[in-house]
Regions:
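Contiguous, structured surface segment used for ligand recognition
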Residues: 1-122
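Conserved, mostly hydrophobic/aromatic
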Residues: 28, 77, 125, 146, ...
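The substrate-binding groove and active-site-proximal loops of carbohydrate-active enzymes
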Residues: 75, 124-136, 192-207
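Aromatic/hydrophobic pocket-lining residues that form the small-molecule binding cavity
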Residues: 81, 139, 206, 210
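Aromatic- and acidic-residue-enriched carbohydrate-binding clefts of CAZyme catalytic domains
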Residues: 118, 162-219, 234-245
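Hydrophobic faces of well-ordered beta-strands that scaffold small-molecule active sites
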Residues: 123-127, 154-156, 224-228
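A conserved hydrophobic secondary-structure block that centers on an alpha-helix together
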Residues: 128-161
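Aromatic/hydrophobic pocket-lining residues that form π-stacking "cages" and hydrophobic walls in ligand
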Residues: 142, 213, 224
C-alpha cells in the first residue's frame, strides 16, 4: 500500500484524469497485494501520491517528484497526468503490468525528479489488420502498449486487397464476402513458386466494435486514424461488388 495519505487527486482534475489515477491505484493494489484508495481533495496532503493541477506546464507535459515523503505529480491536463502514470509504472517492478499479486516484489519507487514533455506532436503506430486480422482484444492490447510508450496516433489499416475489416451497413457484402479469403500466401511475394495456406480466413469489426476501440483509445489519449484504401488496393471490395470495377 502507499504510505502516508494514499493516492489523492486535486479536486480540479477532470474525470478522465481521476479515472486514469483510479485505474493505476487499482492495478497497483492488485499486483502488490496492498490497498490504495483514491480520494479527491481541495487541499492536498504532504505525503502519499498526489496529483496536482499546474497550469504552467504544457498540455502533454508533466513534472514527477519522488522523495522520501511521497510522490507529487504535476500536470495541466489529462494527457500530462496520463503520461506521468506511465512513468510511475515503469519505475515499479514489471509485475505491475500483470494480473496476479506479486507480494515478493520490492514495491519501492526510486527518489527522482522528472520534467517531461513530447518533442513531436504526432507519435504514431500503424497496424495492418487487412492482411492479418486482429481481434478487438488484441487491438486493445496494442493500444495498451502504445500508451506505455506515450504514443498518441493509431493508424488503423482496415482495408486492402487481402480483406475488408469494417462494417458498412449500406454495403453488407463488403464484410459478408470481402472480409474472408480461401487461402493466404506464406512468405514474401518475391518467393517463386508462391506458397499458400489453404482455408477460410478473415474477420471484421462491427460498427459497435469500432466505437468501442475508439473509446478505449481515447481513455489512453490516443486518436484513431482509420484507413480505407480506394481506388488502389481494393480487390476485397471489388470481389464483394465486382460491378464497381
Amino acid at each position: 500500500a502507499v504510505k502516508g495519505e494514499g493516492v489523492v487527486c486535486d479536486s480540479r482534475d477532470d474525470e478522465r484524469t481521476q479515472r486514469a489515477v483510479a485505474e493505476f491505484a487499482a492495478q497497483l493494489a492488485k499486483t502488490s497485494g496492498g490497498e490504495n484508495p483514491v480520494t479527491v481533495a481541495d487541499e492536498l496532503p504532504a505525503s502519499g501520491i498526489r496529483f496536482v493541477l499546474d497550469q504552467t506546464l504544457p498540455e502533454e507535459g508533466y513534472r514527477l517528484d519522488v522523495t522520501p515523503k511521497g510522490v507529487e505529480v504535476r500536470a495541466s491536463r489529462f494527457p500530462g497526468f496520463f503520461y506521468a502514470v506511465q512513468s510511475l509504472r515503469q519505475m515499479l517492478p514489471a509485475a505491475v503490468y500483470g494480473t496476479e499479486p506479486a507480494p515478493g516484489e520490492e514495491w519501492v519507487l526510486p527518489c527522482v525528479s522528472i520534467e517531461d514533455a513530447p518533442r513531436f506532436a504526432y507519435r504514431g503506430m500503424h497496424l495492418d489488420v487487412a492482411r492479418h486480422f486482429f481481434s478487438v482484444e488484441e487491438v486493445k492490447r496494442y493500444l495498451d502498449v502504445m500508451a506505455i510508450h506515450k504514443l498518441n496516433r493509431f493508424h488503423w489499416h482496415l482495408t486492402d486487397d487481402q480483406g475488408w475489416r469494417i462494417e458498412i451497413k449500406r454495403y453488407p457484402r463488403l464484410t459478408q464476402v470481402g472480409a474472408w479469403r480461401s487461402k493466404s500466401q506464406i512468405g514474401s511475394y518475391e518467393e517463386k513458386p508462391a506458397t499458400f495456406e489453404f482455408g477460410r480466413y478473415g474477420g471484421f469489426y462491427t460498427q459497435d466494435e469500432i466505437r468501442e476501440v475508439v473509446a478505449y483509445a481515447a481513455e489512453r489519449y490516443i486518436t484513431v486514424i482509420p484507413e480505407i484504401e480506394m481506388p488502389g488496393h481494393s480487390l476485397a471490395a471489388l470481389t464483394a461488388y465486382p460491378w464497381l470495377g
